Design a protein with these regions (language model features):
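Short functional hotspots at interaction and active-site rims
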Residues: 1-211
């Protein structure tokens, strides 16, 4: 499947420009491992900058998360990759959805399935899928970029250290960051008023899923 510019344009017109951004909740996942290191460094003029990078990447840790204009929502860390069963458990147990919200996901296979839709609609919410290959329309991708930058600097070389760094990185995503990400992706206009009562973040810590 390729990027469809018509679908992207239709999304901007029917969702990004029409839907109240306070109704939108983006759900996605990102991966990290113990080999993450900084990509850039400063050095004296004429000198190369060096750093050590582990040869062993270690087992991947997947972070399932949601984000609204309020900030990061409930998050779940899973050792290894996720499957549909894990994703359905996250949707059922973790997100603090409110009736009337619209849950937005990309087209990853694990995000699709009738059970996922049922769980969301049971809470009085609607489910929408982004146009294919459109990370630029997904504000949580920008949050993940900031989180990965923090993880690279943290250089957690054990799973415990990586998880701890993930918690700090999630804490660093403020409601103001979230609103900036929404604005950059076209869902929020500069100066657009938001209800003050919704400005408190729903993030309440990182939940770990045991093997």
């Amino acid at each position: 499947m390729e990027r469809d510019e018509w679908l992207r344009a239709a999304w901007r017109v029917t969702v990004a420009e029409k839907v109240d951004p306070q109704r939108l909740v983006f759900v996605d996942e990102m991966g990290a491992n113990t080999s993450l290191s900084v990509l850039h460094a400063w050095s004296h003029t004429g000198k190369r900058a060096y750093c050590s990078v582990p040869r062993n990447r270690g087992k991947n840790t997947t972070l399932l998360a949601s984000m609204s204009v309020e900030g990061m929502g409930p998050t779940l860390a899973v050792e290894g990759a996720t499957d549909r069963e894990v994703f359905e458990a996250y949707v059922e147990e973790a997100p603090s959805l409110r009736s009337g919200q619209i849950v937005v996901m990309d087209n990853l296979t694990t995000h699709k399935g009738e059970r996922v839709r049922e769980l969301i609609e049971e809470r009085g919410c609607e489910l929408l899928y982004l146009p294919p290959y459109s990370p630029d329309l997904n504000p949580i991708e920008e949050a993940f970029s900031k989180i990965k930058g923090i993880l690279r600097k943290a250089e957690g070389r054990s799973r415990e250290a990586l998880i701890e760094a993930m918690g700090r990185a999630l804490d660093a995503i403020t409601p103001q960051d979230a609103q900036s990400f929404f604005r950059h992706c076209g869902y929020l206009s500069l100066g657009q008023p938001l209800c003050p009562s919704l400005w408190s973040t729903t993030y309440r810590g990182l939940v770990l899923l045991a093997e």
